[in-house]
């Protein structure tokens, strides 16, 4: 192998040790599965009664227990423009059409579809049991929301320790495009909690604040 040229080396490595297989094998071998990890993770991230039925379901990652899904990220569906809430299912089983309770908002909403991401492609499923990282549509909540069937002690809220450090004014060339701009900025703020969107009341400018020049340029 030492005598191979650079391109031949790359080809050999790809054929004999494809990166995606190596990484997935390492994750499977070295990362604890949800049934093992939740026994020591739950006491650190959930402040409820561990001896309650709900607490026991969380500790054992019980697919037949009370539902507990925590939103960790909001993704905007490019086709429908609607929210897709990604997160982890700690207990219970998700099914389309289920009416759920958003503990932080104090609202009942209904799940429409269930997804598991295969790479960047979402796959529709009929049910998803506890222990999976998945996504749901039809529910409008924020990152950190705890979704259950009835009011329960929620998981600890997410804390964003970084504050925006740079602000830029966003303008449109045509006044008729202003509603589109406002909608795009709203979606950006939904997907990235570190972005702050506001309107300057004196000038009427739409202001977008982020973590730096590169952060705003990427968006």
Question: Can you say where each PLM-predicted feature lies in the sequence?
Answer:
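Structural and coupling elements of P-loop NTPases
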Residues: 1-219
């Amino acid at each position: 192998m030492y005598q191979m040229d650079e391109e031949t080396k790359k080809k050999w490595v790809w054929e004999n040790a494809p990166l995606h297989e190596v990484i997935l094998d390492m994750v499977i071998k070295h990362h604890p599965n949800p049934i093992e990890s939740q026994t020591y993770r739950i006491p650190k991230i959930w402040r409820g009664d561990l001896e309650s039925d709900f607490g026991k379901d969380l500790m054992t990652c019980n697919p037949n227990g009370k539902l507990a899904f925590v939103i960790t990220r909001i993704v905007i569906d490019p086709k429908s423009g609607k929210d897709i809430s990604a997160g982890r299912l700690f207990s219970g089983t998700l099914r389309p059409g289920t009416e759920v309770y958003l503990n932080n908002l104090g609202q009942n909403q209904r799940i429409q579809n269930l997804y598991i991401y295969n790479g960047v492609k979402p796959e529709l499923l009929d049910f998803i049991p506890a222990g999976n990282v998945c996504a749901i549509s039809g529910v409008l909540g924020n990152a950190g929301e705890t979704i259950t069937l009835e009011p329960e002690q929620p998981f600890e809220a997410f804390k964003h320790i970084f504050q925006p450090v740079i602000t830029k004014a966003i303008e449109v060339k045509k006044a008729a495009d202003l509603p589109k701009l406002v909608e795009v900025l709203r979606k950006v703020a939904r997907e990235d909690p570190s972005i702050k969107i506001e309107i300057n009341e004196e000038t009427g400018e739409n202001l977008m604040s982020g973590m730096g020049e590169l952060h705003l340029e990427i968006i």
